[in-house]
A protein has these predicted regions:
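Beta-rich globular "head" domains
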Residues: 24-78, 85, 149-153
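Low-complexity, Ser/Thr/Pro-rich intrinsically disordered segments found in N-terminal tails, propeptides
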Residues: 1-31, 104-113, 119-125
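Extended, solvent-exposed segments with strong compositional bias
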Residues: 73-125
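Noncatalytic modules at the cell exterior or secretory-pathway interfaces
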Residues: 37-47, 121-142
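C-terminal interaction-tip segments
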Residues: 1-19, 34-37, 140-172
Length: 172
């Protein structure tokens, strides 16, 4: 497979801190054309959970807790799905707890999901849109919604038309 130099695709969503699933599409039409034998390989994904300004998020007082999660999929979703769903490219969950009596930066754990994403040979994409979805629970300081941002390191590669179409059909 011939491939390009690596480049970066960025996206973000702002869940409402009420546990409501939100989703945004990421247009890959400039990179992916299965009939033209062009596919995208995602090599790495870096994810940030922050407030809308990129600052560290705080949890509310009184020993509150919270969670924020994301998923990157090849198909549109109406809610969070498990990693067993064939549309899932990547996902992650962060759990947090504030044990103080004032709004503070929380103790964090990400032991329940595969954040960060590590692949030996990357993840091939042959669809022209992928979807970043996520949600955040109550407990985060209400002044700012959580922001889930991701940066993907990618290359464009060529495949045979038959292989690219088969991959595209498997991801729809």
């Amino acid at each position: 497979m011939a491939k390009s130099d690596s480049f970066f695709i960025r996206s973000s969503i702002e869940p409402d801190n009420l546990g409501t699933f939100v989703q945004s599409s990421i247009d890959l039409g400039a990179y992916v054309d299965a009939l033209g034998k062009s596919v995208l390989r995602i090599h790495n994904i870096a994810v940030t959970f922050s407030d809308s300004l990129g600052n560290a998020a705080q949890l509310q007082a009184a020993s509150d807790s919270g969670a924020v999660q994301f998923q990157l999929t090849t198909q549109s979703q109406s809610d969070t799905v498990t990693a067993a769903n064939r549309a899932v490219i990547a996902s992650g969950i962060v759990y947090a707890q504030n044990s103080f009596s004032s709004d503070e930066f929380p103790l964090l754990s990400h032991d329940m999901d595969n954040l960060p994403q590590l692949w030996t040979n990357g993840y091939l994409i042959a669809v022209d849109q992928i979807y970043l979805g996520g949600e955040a629970s109550t407990g985060w300081v209400a002044a700012e919604n959580m922001t889930i941002s991701l940066v993907m390191e990618c290359t464009v590669e060529t495949m045979s038309t038959a292989a690219a179409m088969a991959l595209a059909l498997s991801q729809q």
